[in-house]
Amino acid sequence: MEGISALEKNVAELTVMDVYDIASAVGQEFERVIDQYGCEVIGRLMPKVVRVLEILEVLVSRNHINPEMEELRLELDRLRLERMDRIEKEKKHQKELELVEDVWRGEAQDLLNQIAQLQEENKQLVSNLSQKDINLTEEEFQKHEGMSERERQVMKKLKEVVDKQRDEIRAKDRELVLKNEDVEALQQQQSRLMKINHDLRHRVTVVEAQGKALIEQKVELEAYLQTKEQEAASMRLEIGKLRDKLKGEQHTNGEEIKTETLNEESILETEKLSLDLKDSNRPRFTLQELRDVLHERNELKAKVFMLQEELAYYKSEEADEEHKLPQSSPVIDSKAPIPQESGIKRLFSFFSRDKKRMPMMQKNVHFQESFGQWTEYNRDDVYTEQGQEALQHM
């Protein structure tokens, strides 16, 4: 901060020395103007600038003093508020003490009155006993003792019954707590299953959409292949018509022989170009095109297979959950899944657990390795019958 000039500082950080630096800089500028234009140019401006600098000096000095004064004023206000709060608390405490003392005095007076009343009753009972002549016989005394013994036994039995009932109540309370915990756990499990069911239904919808897209792609490929087959059939018909036409136009002279030779050569070239479909060794496509088509076909079949298995698994899981919890998800409305049973599903239900997921992954790896070995084996220009049949059936 030492390299920053006074004019570049923040207003809150200015000091009196910074004001003097500003005044010095302004004075230097005035000297340059005076040297260049004379004193008359700034004669009226200089007193105003000096006054502004004096005001700035006073304000800066106040700003340095005012924070301390403001802090002291705030501290004084805080102490006053604390003192007032303390006085209020003391007054409140004093009132509470007075109320407690009044209550205590009232209770003490009531107790004294009760003691006096009991003393009077005691004196009256003593006087009554002294006046009466109570002569209890021995039989009455034994009878009284027997009654007391029976009462003690009854009280003991009642106490045992009460203790037993208390233990049963405590056991019932513990069972009730456990039942409540089980109910809470079941409710949490129900909410979790509802969430899983919602996610599975969403995934089933996505899988169905993917399956529809793949089916549409398959239909488009089949239509494309049918158009190609129709084009090949039309080319065969044109070749047959050209051949019949050339055979009907043969002549007996030498020019006719030359023309026939030329026609036969053109027919051979046309036949070579049109590709005889009866020849099993005809070059229908290049090797790279054959590989690309077979690879794409196998990928699509694998995707369709995996999507069908996943869809069947999700539908079966949804059916099981709805069978276990028929009223678990009243908010979500969706179509009831149709359970599908197939041998492939029983063999490759790999989406349920991690143990079932591994065989399918190994099968996909084996399929990719076998397809890679087939492409490595067919690197030359030989066309196998299996590849040709696959192209014809696509």
From Swiss-Prot:
Domain RH2, chain residue ranges per copy: 282-347
GO biological process: epithelial cell morphogenesis; nitric oxide mediated signal transduction; protein transport from ciliary membrane to plasma membrane
Coiled coil: 68-312
RH1 domain ranges (all copies): 2-89
Main location: cytoplasm
MF annotations from Gene Ontology: protein dimerization activity
UniProt-annotated location(s): Cytoplasm, Cytosol; Cytoplasm, Cytoskeleton, Microtubule organizing center, Centrosome; Cell projection, Cilium
Keywords noted in UniProt: Cell projection, Cilium, Coiled coil, Cytoplasm, Cytoskeleton, Protein transport, Transport
A single cellular component GO annotation: membrane
Stretch list, region Disordered: 318-337
PROSITE patterns: RH1 (PS51776), RH2 (PS51777)
Functional summary from the UniProt entry: Plays a role in the regulation of cell shape and polarity. Plays a role in cellular protein transport, including protein transport away from primary cilia. Neuroprotective protein.
Record family assignment: Belongs to the RILPL family.
Protein name: RILP-like protein 1
Taxon lineage: Eukaryota, Metazoa, Chordata, Craniata, Vertebrata
Gene: rilpl1
